[in-house]
């Protein structure tokens, strides 16, 4: 198995000067973006200890101040997110994410004599051009908002999808490849959502000699090859299962599809895919070619394959979790250990026009980290006389490793109450 690493420009031009002082030389098919909302630039952050001062990405040390910038009004990367950079769960062979990645690699290695190149160490810090423009995300798309995406500066983001590397790899002459990596999105808090998760992108380019003589046009040829490939992958992972294709829309493929399988008496969406929009190929000097692409979320599939009930488990270092995957193989079913009791706390406040739930979740997560299991809106009403709207959220605190004390939870809740007033311009009730 050959895994490649390609050097790429990981910061925007606006960031280069800052990085040089530290020794630097210079779409998504999965999990649709949340709805658009206004964003209130973050105020000066309180440091919460311990704080990671630097991380290693592809052999390059990146300092905290390169990514978490209190003096930049467009920067919305908290320390809790910076600490996840460089952890690369997908490169751990005895971790559920790494096990699943390797199983997918095995499928492609076994079924394609013309091997797919593998890239899994590309920096998650990319330009807005790479993350949005190169994959045809419209200028007014909600995914570009500060409410949905982590911005390092106005031209640099933490990638929202592994598709951010697609154009760069095509321009460098790669035509069949798999890209795996950690991706970042501001999101809600519950058992299936986390601001950092892992994706795999697959891409395959065809030349005219591939489809000439088949009796099919280039688009149909690519679409049929894509479906054959992914149906085989689904059988490789899930066994003999019923499947169905659903037509859908992505800005970077046409036609576009979702593959669903009938698993445990329900239809499960496995991945999104499609025939690549011709303009993407043309911009990479491949105007005479056709291609297909797919993207899948590794956590989503791993939770199903390994029976993992909460996405936070993937980040756990508890031996009761990690030891269950020591063989590095599919087929293991997670055996839950004692589930510690939840602690419920409610918070109510009058919201402003700039309020968004993603911003609120970021505040809660920044304080409680993985001790918060869920944040849920349980009530809202509008006072017509005052012209104000109130939201009431229930925060569920629960550790996966120990029982939380009342004192701990009360302290966390108190900090949440203080911070939401300072950062979100809301009035507590």
Swiss-Prot record:
A molecular function (GO) term: phenylalanine-tRNA ligase activity
InterPro entries associated with the record: aa-tRNA-synth_II, aa-tRNA-synth_II/BPL/LPL, Fdx_antiC-bd, Fdx_antiC-bd_sf, Phe-tRNA-synth_IIc_mito, Phenylalanyl-tRNA_Synthase
EC number of this enzyme: 6.1.1.20
Location(s) in or outside the cell: Plastid, Chloroplast stroma; Mitochondrion matrix
Main location: plastid
SUPFAM superfamilies: Anticodon-binding domain of PheRS (SSF54991), Class II aaRS and biotin synthetases (SSF55681)
Transit peptide, residues from-to: 1-53
Residues noted as binding substrate in the record, renumbered to the chain: 163-166, 185, 192-194, 199-201, 269, 294
Keywords: Acetylation, Aminoacyl-tRNA synthetase, ATP-binding, Chloroplast, Ligase, Mitochondrion, Nucleotide-binding, Plastid, Protein biosynthesis, Transit peptide
Entry GO CC: chloroplast; chloroplast stroma; cytosol; mitochondrial matrix; mitochondrion
Pfam families with a match to the protein in the record: FDX-ACB (PF03147), tRNA-synt_2d (PF01409)
Modified residue annotations for N-acetylalanine: 54
Family named by the database record: Belongs to the class-II aminoacyl-tRNA synthetase family.
Known partners and oligomeric status: Monomer.
Function: Is responsible for the charging of tRNA(Phe) with phenylalanine in mitochondrial translation.
UniProt cross-references to NCBIfam families, sorted A to Z: pheS_mito
Protein name as it appears in the record: Phenylalanine--tRNA ligase, chloroplastic/mitochondrial
